[in-house]
Amino acid sequence: MSDYLIKALAYDGMARVYAAVTTETIKEAQRRHDTWSVSSAALGRTMTGTLFLGAMQKEDQKITVKIEGDGPIGPIVADSNAQGQIRGFVTNPHVHFSELNEAGKLDVRRGVGTSGMLSVVKDLGFGENFTGQTPIVSGEIGEDFTYYLATSEQVNSSVGVGVLVNPDDTIEAAGGFMLQLLPGATDEIIDEIEKNLTALPTVSRMIEAGETPESILAKLAGGEDKLQILEKIPVSFECNCSKERFGSAIISLGKDEIRSMIEEDHGAEAECHFCRNTYDFSEEELEKLYEEAK
């Protein structure tokens, strides 16, 4: 099944809800970055949470999330847009612990760390950026997105994200949900939401069992008939890097730096952090970039 995201309204229009299956997307991220179990879970959760923030944006806007904890994984970066395109990377892809956490799951909190910051940069187009930042409160990532939305954007939300990793480090299931209360929600509605959230199985297990974004939202809303589906968005790992972009980056280094690349290295190789694609620049190509540099 191809990955996709569903946007809907629930609870008589008093809650905005999103759910996504991201299994194939996170499989692609794992393949590109050769991530081990805990790094895979942390990267997959971050990418899925970022996907939801991207889905809240207008057509030409982009969102970048950076989670910088004090754990061995190091900074995690993901970006997404309103079209369901997502990419991400983790500083240390090779984190695996032989022990599970007290809940019998991969110890993502230990990998990410419990001290640090979650930063969100919204590229609003026209060269305008909005930046929000909140401390890491959990290291489990879903709770950290929830705290960010409540604190920085003043939206009471619940974010659940999960990745099921096989013993051979391949990805079995990935996805998540996000629920946001809208103004006017009554105490009765809030009680019902809390009851349904408590009864919800873990996201990765639901997806492993074959649940779809629609069926996850039906569980969250207390029935299919209580959902008003607004939009279905295909989701995929997409990177917009190119040799031209890296060429521009090399030009920005200045003539001295480019000259040393030519004379000492006789060329250059650039690698994209997000997708691991590499771009080779010959001496001749560097000479052309040298002429364009200041």
Swiss-Prot record:
Q: What is this protein called?
A: 33 kDa chaperonin
Biological process terms from the Gene Ontology for this record are:
protein refolding
Q: Which InterPro entries match?
A: Heat_shock_Hsp33, Heat_shock_Hsp33_C, Heat_shock_Hsp33_N
CDD domains membership: Hsp33 (cd00498)
What's noted about post-translational modification? Under oxidizing conditions two disulfide bonds are formed involving the reactive cysteines. Under reducing conditions zinc is bound to the reactive cysteines and the protein is inactive.
Q: Quote the subcellular location field of this record.
A: Cytoplasm
Q: Which Pfam families match?
A: HSP33
Q: Which UniProt keywords apply?
A: Chaperone, Cytoplasm, Disulfide bond, Redox-active center, Zinc
- Molecular function GO labels: protein folding chaperone; unfolded protein binding
Q: Which GO terms describe its cellular component?
A: cytoplasm
- Return the similarity comment: Belongs to the HSP33 family.
UniProt keyword annotation of Transmembrane present? no
What gene does the UniProt entry assign to this protein?
hslO
What's this chain's function? Redox regulated molecular chaperone. Protects both thermally unfolding and oxidatively damaged proteins from irreversible aggregation. Plays an important role in the bacterial defense system toward oxidative stress.
Q: Which cysteines are joined by disulfide bonds?
A: 239-241, 272-275
* Origin: domain of life: Bacteria
